[in-house]
Each structure stands twice: as structure tokens, then as C-alpha cells.
């Protein structure tokens, strides 16, 4: 865990704003999930409206082979399925990447069944305001998300990036009989998404990225945690992956690495060698995940004892920018853009309202969002 001390922040905080590199990417982690339930069209649209460069849908498969957006294939934490008596018999326990998980799983539902569910906030104790949207939004498909992106591109006149992650591809291939890499390439082609669009495809598993590298020209990102290793390569550790030799190997099939913040910043807030080592290998570095609440910040950046209170996320962003990362995944798109001083994307009024306890976009009506 990162444990920054206050003294380490002084030089970074001497100036209130940062000059943002125009190539620095703000990636909406599960959409604007700090303000709407994650992986809903409402979260993605809000992120786009707030200026995100990319939106990030995590993809799992339904029983009938449709990609839908959920952070994991167990859907009990983020939908109302537990309250739906007609699906009670679908509750089960599975071994997902070696871990026993009990709940309801996307691959056991048809798309028609999933369409009847509604999303809910994952962490209401930390983000209670998001819980007011519980029950409003359905689970979107990849096609729904692409249609939203195309509509917002037409509306705004700017290009909007897609940054999908294939979740648990080895498990889902065994469970569904569908190769997620092949299926994703076919789906993107069907939806007229090409490598000329703004697309990164990410995964923790190496085989699926290698397969995508052989099948397509899409940009690929190897996800890397601080510990453990890819489930498809038990003899390989993530620690080995972030060495110069490991990064050179990653560069044979991927264009970048998506890494935990702890792999970019040392305990005192100074940068590790990862960014420079990745650059030597020709890889971009996107760091995850920036969240504004104390519960997710290093102790030295927390303000008060309340985990739900907003801490000094701007200092964390300053450190990441100083470390030279090429972009960040964030739940909090507008605060991130404002803190980074992204003049191309931010709105001065919205940024001014960040210090006020009020919504910055109109509250949707239930009849507008419930299908």
C-alpha cells in the first residue's frame, strides 16, 4: 500500500495547477462510477459529458454469448438479482480463477433475463449519493455502449475512446465454449469499430492478448497487479513482468501496460523505474485507479477520519503526472480533469462547482431510463 507522508508532497503542491500533457489520457473507470452506478449507460454518458478521453467497459458473457458490461461475472454486488425470486435457483458457488465465489453469474443468464435486472451502487457506504440511482439502469451490452459512443461523437464532434477489458477469459471460455478474443474481434467488426478508432483492449491474461495480437491491429494493454501473476501462466509473476526484460517480453504482443498505482509510485511518493523502463520497451503506461475518497487514498493524502470524505486526490494526480504516466483510470472524471488542468476538456463552471455539494448535471427521470 502507498503511504505518502505530508513532507513528500510539498514540492508537488507548491503550484495549484498542473500543465497537462496533451497526450495524457483520462480513462473513465467503469464510466463516471464515482457519480453513477458503475457500468451503466448513465455512467458512461456522464463521463463523456465531463470530458473523458476513453470509457472503460469490463466485458463478460451471457449464456447466449452476448458481451455485457460488468466488472466481474458475479452480478450480485452490482444488480438487484438477489431480490428477484424468479432467479433464486441460479445462485451457486463457482471457482473463478482459483477462488470460490458464491452468487449469480452472468454466464448463467440469457441476455433477455439480464435485461430485466437493474444496476445498483457497489459501495453505498462510501458513495451514498450513487444509491439514489439504484434500480434505474439496466445492464448494457457492448452494442449499447458502442451506439452511445457513436451518438455522443455525433453530438459533440469529438472522438471518444473505448477501453474494454476481457474479464476472466480462461474461465469464460471453459464455461461458455466461446473464445472471448475471437468473439470480441467479430463483435467489433460487426459494430464497425476498427483499429483506426480510439480503442485499447486490456486483460490480465497473456494468452488472450497474444490471440488478439494475431487476430487484429487493435492496441493492447497488459494489466499488471502488485502481486501474484497471470492465472493462465502460473510460472510467471507480475513482479517479473515489470522488470526491463519482462516489459520487453510484454512489448512483443502489447502496446502498453495498465498498472496498479503502487507499481508507479514508491512509499514516499517518488516514482519507481517502471515508466522509464516501459518507455524503453516502447510501451505506454496507464495507472489505476484514482478515486477521491479517503478510503482509497494513501494515509498521507487523507483528510480526516471519514473514509467517504474527499481527500487530497489532486496530490496523487500530481505525483502520477510527475512520474510520467501516459494516463490514469479514474472513477472521478471531472475532479481528475479539473485537478490536472486539462484546458481542452474541462469546464470552468463545472470545476468551480466541485467544492459545492450539488449535482452538476440534471437528475434523470425514472421514466427516461427504465426500459
What positions do the PLM features span?
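Sec-dependent signal peptide recognition
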Residues: 1-7
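Hydrophobic h-region of N-terminal signal peptides that target proteins for export
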Residues: 10-18
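Phosphate-group recognition and catalysis centered on beta-loop-alpha active-site segments
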Residues: 17-371
Amino acid at each position: 500500500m502507498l503511504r505518502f507522508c505530508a513532507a513528500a508532497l510539498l514540492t508537488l503542491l507548491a503550484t495549484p495547477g498542473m500543465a497537462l500533457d496533451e497526450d495524457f489520457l483520462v480513462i473513465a473507470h467503469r464510466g463516471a462510477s464515482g457519480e453513477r452506478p458503475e457500468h451503466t449507460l448513465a455512467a458512461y454518458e456522464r463521463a463523456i459529458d465531463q470530458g473523458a478521453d476513453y470509457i472503460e467497459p469490463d466485458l463478460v458473457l451471457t449464456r447466449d454469448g452476448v458481451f455485457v458490461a460488468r466488472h466481474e461475472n458475479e452480478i450480485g454486488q452490482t444488480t438487484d438479482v438477489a431480490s428477484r425470486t424468479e432467479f433464486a435457483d441460479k445462485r451457486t458457488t463457482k471457482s473463478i480463477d482459483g477462488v470460490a465465489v458464491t452468487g449469480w453469474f452472468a454466464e448463467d443468464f440469457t441476455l433477455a433475463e439480464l435485461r430485466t435486472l437493474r444496476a445498483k451502487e457497489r459501495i453505498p457506504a462510501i458513495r451514498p449519493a450513487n444509491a439514489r440511482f439504484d434500480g434505474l439502469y439496466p445492464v448494457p451490452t457492448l452494442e449499447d455502449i458502442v451506439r452511445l459512443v457513436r451518438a455522443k461523437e455525433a453530438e459533440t464532434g469529438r472522438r471518444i475512446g473505448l477501453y474494454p477489458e476481457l474479464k476472466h477469459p480462461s474461465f469464460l471460455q471453459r464455461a461458455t465454449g466461446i473464445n472471448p478474443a475471437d468473439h470480441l474481434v467479430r463483435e467489433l467488426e460487426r459494430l464497425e469499430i476498427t483499429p483506426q478508432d480510439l480503442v485499447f483492449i486490456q486483460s490480465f491474461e497473456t494468452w488472450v492478448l497474444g490471440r488478439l495480437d494475431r487476430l487484429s491491429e487493435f492496441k493492447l494493454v497488459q494489466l499488471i497487479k502488485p502481486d501474484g501473476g497471470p492465472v493462465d501462466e502460473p510460472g510467471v509473476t507480475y513482479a517479473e513482468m515489470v522488470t526491463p526484460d519482462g516489459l520487453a517480453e510484454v512489448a512483443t504482443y502489447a502496446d502498453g501496460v495498465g498498472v496498479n498505482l503502487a507499481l508507479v509510485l514508491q512509499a514516499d511518493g517518488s516514482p519507481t523505474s517502471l515508466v522509464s523502463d516501459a518507455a524503453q520497451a516502447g510501451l505506454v503506461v496507464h495507472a489505476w485507479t484514482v478515486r477521491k475518497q479517503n478510503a482509497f487514498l494513501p494515509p498521507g493524502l487523507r483528510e480526516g477520519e471519514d473514509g467517504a470524505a474527499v481527500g487530497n486526490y489532486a496530490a496523487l494526480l500530481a505525483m502520477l503526472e510527475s512520474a510520467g504516466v501516459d494516463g490514469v483510470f479514474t472513477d472521478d472524471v471531472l475532479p481528475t480533469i479539473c485537478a490536472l488542468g486539462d484546458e481542452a476538456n474541462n469546464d470552468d463552471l463545472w470545476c468551480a462547482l466541485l467544492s459545492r455539494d450539488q449535482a452538476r448535471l440534471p437528475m434523470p427521470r425514472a421514466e427516461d431510463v427504465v426500459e
